[in-house]
Amino acid sequence: MTSEAPRVKNKNPAPIQISAEQLLREAVERQDVAFVPPKINITDLEELQEFQGRKRKEFEDAIRRNRLAMGHWMRYGQWELDQKEFARARSVFERALDVDSTYIPLWLKYIECEMKNRNINHARNLFDRAVTQLPRVDKLWYKYVYMEEMLGNITGCRQVFERWLKWEPDENCWMSYIRMERRYHENERARGIYERFVVVHPEVTNWLRWARFEEECGNAANVRQVYLAAIDALGQEFLNERFFIAFAKFEIRQKEYERARTIFKYAIDFMPRSKSMELYKEYTHFEKQFGDHLGVESTVLDKRRLQYEKLLKDSPYDYDTWLDLLKLEESAGDINTIRETYEKAIAKVPEVVEKNAWRRYVYIWLNYCLFEEIDVKDVDRARKVYQEALKLIPHKKFTFAKLWLMYAMFELRQRKIDVARKTLGRALGMCPKPKLFRGYIEFEDAIKQFDRCRILYEKWILYDPEACAPWLGYAALETKLGDSDRARALYNLAVNQPILETPELVWKAYIDFEFEEMEYGKARSIYQQLLRTAPHVKVWISFANFEIAHLEDDDEEPPNEEVASPTAVVRARNVFENALAHLRQQGLKEERVVLLEAWKQFEAMHGTEDTRKHVSSLMPQVVKKRRRLEDGSFEEYLDYLFPDTATDQGDKMRKMLELSRKWKEEMAKKKLEA
């Protein structure tokens, strides 16, 4: 089949059979012209007032037709806000709340509008009304406390949390309150919340959270009191092996081995054996490490140490063995021995300057840094280890983003943000890798420095404009910040790039963005732009699904929520028809079959009997054909014979298939009669 459709001189219909071309031509000629709303130019105040009155009448009519459609109310209120008619906007939202005060998006939209216009007291009053009427809706409470915290009103934030806790919400609320107090280093308040928390939700997990909190605060006596209080409060019915294992491991970390042994023995006597298999395993492991037979255990450790040292003598650059030896020494707990082992391990610098040969070696450095920071709590020594590791790596050949990022996060934990920034900036200057860009951006995003995030995204795009990750990440950041125009501009720049690694991801994200913004016309334009550059059958099908998935303002209202709008169905059907015409013109048979199958499913859900028959009439017949190969042999293959194939050979093939089908039906009837 040629790439272009043959030019038909005689456009009159055939006396017997009507061609597909004639059907399409008549369909186009009879097609109604789409309504294009006139462009309005407002020149004076009187015209503006007349326009506003007309729009208000349209909104009021839409509300009268379906007063329960909250989308009309929200669009009405938003329009009034766009006109700077704040009193009218509030009136619209209040009327909507009178209709349905349980519709959460309406409350959020109302509050968001007040916050955007910096009417904080109005927003606070609305939150009070919302949580009073809907105290079981957690989203309203979360938004409320988030607003108060962002405003710096920590006292008000606590008051909101206390109001919320009176309703005894789920665990996430309590943990959010605790995390808020910990962010402001109010550990005593957090401790008081935990005391109330375990009364309302006395699960083992919550007691363990409290114990972990006390351990992080560095008060071992309080941790023990929490565990003992949990034993008294929960009793045998609710305690499990995980609780006792956590208690014992805490005592092990405190080097209180006799206490840990007592806990294990008590738990074994307390818990039934069927529910304490992991407890027995941990106790056995504990006794092997810290049991009474210290000589035996020491012999076992020495034996394993000798085995590792022998292996390292034969293969001094076997870094997996070094890691096993270091793990063994860390389990022994001798800090000086552990340091000596680390120094011996890092002295074995790989002889080959290749990244794969350095990977496991760098892990030794990372473990060394974590050991000094976490186990020994020697911050200065940990910093020195990080710096020595960075000096050693040949950055001109390769680098390890994980090391740079861990060092930056280490400095952040020490509250040296400038040093962390300089470290990451130095890393990007020496070796700009995507992982470093991503880590640096996450670092700035974590401390809410969004302008710096923008600068980093711009540098990333300049460095690698063909990569999709910086474009998508930048646009997602602007979307998160609520700047839709900047996000849209970024997506537009991305799709217009001459070369992209995976452009389909950018197109999909762009379309999803416009769909979430309810800018359906812009999303449609993006689909049309994509089809001009990549007219793939999947894009056509996605375009049709998009048309049926949304309801525009001028669309005909569906009879119920389960049925699509007739106007949307017509739009989607037009997309399928255009796609079929394009694929027919390009001579893409398999793609036409895929499209027709999707169209058939669409008509099965949204079409009528006539439209289903029409699509079925377009389905091809599968025929077997033979073709000659280069070596002179033949092979069979499947081909598609479409009803609109305008060739003599196709007509003969269809007639032959029709005769074959009739013969089979006659033979089947004869068998039944016999």
From Swiss-Prot:
InterPro entries: HAT, HAT_Syf1-like_N, HAT_Syf1_CNRKL1_C, Syf1-like, TPR-like_helical_dom_sf. GO terms for biological process: mRNA cis splicing, via spliceosome; mRNA splicing, via spliceosome; spliceosomal complex assembly. HAT repeats lie at residues 50-82, 84-116, 118-150, 152-183, 185-216, 218-253, 255-289, 299-331, 333-367, 377-413, 415-446, 448-480, 482-516, 518-549, 567-608, 610-643. It comes from the Eukaryota. It is found in: Nucleus. Coiled coil: none annotated. Gene3D superfamilies: Tetratricopeptide repeat domain. One of its GO terms (cellular component) is spliceosomal complex. Disulfide bonds: none annotated. It holds the Pfam family HAT_Syf1_CNRKL1_C. Keywords: mRNA processing, mRNA splicing, Nucleus, Repeat, Spliceosome. Belongs to the crooked-neck family. PANTHER family: CROOKED NECK-LIKE PROTEIN 1 (PTHR11246:SF3), PRE-MRNA SPLICING FACTOR (PTHR11246). Belongs to the 40S cdc5-associated complex (or cwf complex), a spliceosome sub-complex reminiscent of a late-stage spliceosome composed of the U2, U5 and U6 snRNAs and at least brr2, cdc5, cwf2/prp3, cwf3/syf1, cwf4/syf3, cwf5/ecm2, spp42/cwf6, cwf7/spf27, cwf8, cwf9, cwf10, cwf11, cwf12, prp45/cwf13, cwf14, cwf15, cwf16, cwf17, cwf18, cwf19, cwf20, cwf21, cwf22, cwf23, cwf24, cwf25, cwf26, cyp7/cwf27, cwf28, cwf29/ist3, lea1, msl1, prp5/cwf1, prp10, prp12/sap130, prp17, prp22, sap61, sap62, sap114, sap145, slu7, smb1, smd1, smd3, smf1, smg1 and syf2. Involved in pre-mRNA splicing and cell cycle progression. Required for the spliceosome assembly and initiation of the DNA replication. This is Pre-mRNA-splicing factor cwf4. It comes from Schizosaccharomyces pombe (strain 972 / ATCC 24843).
